[in-house]
Design a protein with these regions (language model features):
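Ankyrin repeat domain, specifically the short helix-to-loop turn at the C-terminus of the second helix
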Residues: 239-247, 272-281, 308-315, 342-349, ...
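Leucine/isoleucine-rich amphipathic helices and adjacent mixed helix/strand linkers
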Residues: 1-269
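Leucine-rich solenoid repeat scaffolds
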Residues: 735-777
Length: 800
């Protein structure tokens, strides 16, 4: 232990401790350190052991403030903040056996092995739980706590321990109830209407219990009996009942009586105490869910409580809650075999009662895969295994198949009164269909082994077969089992979109399923759906499933150019737009793939789509084809691939296209007559403008047909000094060309928008060098004297 404490950081201490746990003698090290703790000065020894007791026996990790306040309780009538020790003191007194987690600000033992050591050496602490319970109750009874008006969302920093105290006092009291604990608990619970601390118990304690807190739902009906019943404090419950002041049938804000809480939590001792009274109604239901004590005990699997309640002659075994569910229904769903067995042994039990959704106990047990419960229920001759529920229309077999409960399916199929082909009325799904969709191989195998199972039944929701569902989700083993059946038709398309299993598999990228289906000569690889008219190759190409595309292209009867009916787009078109480089490469390896096929919607080629999207790798692959048409314009805007790339700002694509001599850099779109240079200047794409202007055959003065504006006009208006400078470096640039819409020159556009430097450059280009600048908004400029030498625009631009 000295070696551990000798390390200077917490990380190194833990590392050293982990090394020690691999060897022997760690218990001796803990014993030695605990002896040192006890050998300290009396008050420090007492505090050190109390710290270890709290940290090792608390129900959850305590925050620093919580632990400090807990150790500051001395049994007086109010909290004295002067008695609260500092965390540094606690750390010192425990001699390094505890640590503070910085991230959560909680106090923990230095290692999990110390927790194990303290658990096995329980004689180190005398009555730890009663001591903790006493501190919790004392804290809650403090005048300072009582006088505080609690809120639902926070605990004030002045009383940080109230949260833990209200949530866990009963847990500790149930384990060890001394006379002192009982006295303090009665003071708290009996004085519910007097003490605000009792309300604190509800407001914060119920939050800890996982119950909803609502400011408008005051716990008026809550009494001390509810608290004692919830925690299972038997001696406190007896003491409260002996006072004869509290109504044992009083309900809390959720409509629970004390018996309900005791049964729900499985506190058989408290249930026994309450059952000895004549004024306890064992069939009372809570107002929130309508469940009786028996129903709650059955749902949570508390066999001891269920047994005691069943011994009462007046208990109603078949009483239903607001959902129409019986105790047997709840026990069956949760797989509580012992409870189910006890209930089925009762003569007046109704084992096949349906709830409001027509689900029986068997249906719930099957849905959860509760094999033993299913077996017990099926042994009852009065249980019908073919009853379908009204919510989803599923039978027990359908539920079991959907969730993959193979053993349950086998048990049900052994029954002569179970129809393996029955489809639910809601969407017409058979058990095989559900098993195939979810990939439950064992269930599918059991069903397919039966000759009376129809593998081609289509559902009413989507019109899909089991093979279609399995193919869509890529369940290869199930697909293989289905294809091994001679009566399975692999080409049955669904009735919704007319999609075949192959199309579903291709769209999902399920290469293994595609391979198995294509091995069948009777599978048509070109069958398209009716909604979009797209083939399996089209879907796979769009999503970039290279392996699927390869398998499809291996078929001799594949049509790689088949366009869809909605947009008239080929697989290459879809792959090019989405940047599926490997798919594009595979398609272009085929000589029968036409790279220039334009779609029917916009008249765009694969190169056009790739250029617009900046798919440079795809563009590169397409340019390797000698038969690609570089200047093909679309029917929507009349734009070529170069125009699309320039308009979208894809510099690298523009550069690749311009390397081809057969690309016309001056071609304009047919809609507004805009060139690539026009788009670059308009949108401020300086790099693209530079690349275009490097072409000797570029026309820098070509204006659009809508406004009659040149690239220089747009650059001057937007204030793009670099583009203006690059344009003015061209000897053939017309700096004084006016547009046709407003009749403004580039100089006028620059002046109107306050671009002073550009205006100066244009004046110099035009030979206009005035002494003073024209009046500009909020700015006055001076210009060189006419006698002063003026730098050429190109030299001036190099400064910028």
């Amino acid at each position: 232990m000295d070696a551990i404490l000798g390390e200077v950081t917490l990380s190194r201490r833990r590392k050293k401790l982990d090394e020690m746990t691999k060897g022997e003698g760690l218990g001796d090290a803990y014993a030695t350190t605990l002896s040192r703790v006890r050998a300290q000065q009396r008050s420090r020894s007492k505090l050190g052991m109390e710290v270890l007791m709290w940290v090792s026996h608390a129900e959850r990790a305590l925050h620093v403030d919580e632990l400090c306040h807990a150790l500051g309780v001395e049994g007086s009538t109010d909290l004295d903040i002067r008695n609260v020790p500092a965390i540094e003191t606690l750390l010192a007194c425990s001699l390094g056996l505890i640590t503070v987690e910085k991230s959560s600000c909680t106090v923990r033992l230095i290692h999990y092995t110390l927790q194990e050591y303290l658990f096995h050496n329980s004689d180190l602490f005398l009555g730890p739980h009663s001591m903790i319970a006493e501190v919790c109750l004392t804290y809650l009874n403090f005048r300072h706590v009582r006088d505080f008006s609690p809120t639902l969302d926070s605990i004030p920093p002045t009383i940080p321990f109230v949260g833990y105290a209200s949530c866990y006092w009963g847990t500790h009291a149930r384990r060890e109830t001394t006379e002192s604990v009982k006295r303090l608990a009665l003071e708290l619970l009996e004085g519910y209407d007097k003490h605000i601390s009792s309300k604190m118990l509800i407001l914060h304690g119920m939050d800890c219990w996982g119950l909803p807190l609502d400011e408008d739902r005051r716990p008026e009906g809550f009494s001390g009996l509810h608290g004692a019943a919830y925690f299972g404090c038997e001696e406190i419950m007896v003491a409260l009942l002996e006072m004869n002041k509290l109504d044992v049938q009083a309900i809390d804000l959720n409509g629970n009586v004390a018996m309900t809480w005791a049964a729900r939590r499985g506190h058989s001792g408290v249930v026994r105490i309450l059952l000895q009274r004549n004024d306890v109604d064992t069939n009372i239901a809570d107002t929130e869910y309508g469940q009786t004590p028996l129903s709650w005990a059955a749902e949570n699997g508390h066999e001891g409580v269920v047994r005691m309640l069943l011994e009462q002659n007046n208990v109603d075994l078949n009483m239903v809650d607001k959902y129409g569910r019986t105790p047997l229904s709840w026990a069956a769903e949760n797989g509580h075999e012992g409870v189910v067995r006890m209930l089925l042994e009762q003569n007046n039990i109704s084992p096949d009662m349906s709830d409001k959704y027509s689900r029986t106990p068997l249906s719930w047990a099957v849905g959860g895969g509760r094999e033993a419960v299913v077996r017990m229920l099926l042994e009852r001759g009065s249980v019908d295994p073919g009853v379908a529920d009204t919510q989803d229309g599923q039978t027990p077999l359908s539920w079991a198949a959907e969730h993959g409960h193979e053993v349950v399916v086998r048990m049900l199929l052994e029954r002569d009164d179970v129809d393996p082909n029955i489809a639910d009325p809601q969407d017409g799904r058979t058990p095989l269909s559900l098993a195939a969709e979810n990939g439950h191989e064992g269930v599918a195998r059991l069903l397919l082994q039966r000759n009376d199972v129809d593998p081609n039944m289509i559902d009413t929701e989507c019109g899909q077969t089991p093979l279609s569902w399995a193919a869509e989700h890529g369940h290869e083993v199930v697909v293989r089992m289905l294809l091994e059946r001679n009566d399975v038709d692999p080409n049955i398309a669904d009735t919704k979109d007319d999609r075949t299993p192959l199309l579903w598999a291709a769209e999902g990228g399920h290469e293994g399923v595609v391979r198995m289906l294509l091995e069948r000569n009777d599978v048509d690889p070109n069958k398209a759906d009716i909604r979009y008219g797209r083939t399996p190759l089209s879907w796979a190409a769009e999503d970039g499933y290279k392996e699927v595309v390869e398998k499809l292209l291996e078929r001799n009867d594949i049509n790689p150019n088949k366009a869809d009916i909605q947009y008239g787009r080929t697989p290459l078109s879809w792959a090019a737009e989405n940047g599926r480089n490997e798919v594009v490469e595979k398609l272009l390896e085929r000589n029968d793939v036409n790279p220039n096929t334009a779609d029917t919607q916009y008249g765009r080629t694969p190169l056009s789509w790739a250029a617009e999207g900046g798919r440079k790798e795809v563009v590169e692959k397409l340019l390797e084809r000698n038969d690609v048409n570089l200047n093909k314009d679309d029917t929507q805007h009349g734009r070529t691939p170069l125009l699309w790339a320039a308009q979208r700002g894809h510099e690298e694509v523009v550069e690749m296209l311009l390397k081809r001599k057969d690309v016309d850099p001056n071609i304009a779109d047919t809609k507004h007559g805009r060139t690539s240079l026009w788009w670059a200047a308009r949108n401020g794409y300086q790099a693209i403008a530079r690349i275009l202007l490097e072409r000797r055959d570029i026309n820098p003065n070509k204006a659009d047909t809508r406004d009659g504006r040149t690239p220089l006009s747009w650059a001057a208006e937007s204030g793009d000094e670099r583009v203006v400078g690059m344009l003015l470096e061209r000897n053939n640039v017309g700096p004084n060309i006016a547009d046709t819409q407003y009749g403004r020159t580039p100089l006028e556009w620059a002046t109107r928008n306050g671009h002073q430097i550009i205006a100066t450059l244009l004046r110099e280009q035009l030979g206009l060098v005035p002494r003073y600048a024209p009046s500009l908004p909020s700015t006055e400029l001076s210009f060189p004297e006419p006698s002063e030498p003026s730098e050429p625009p190109s030299k001036r631009m190099r400064r910028f």
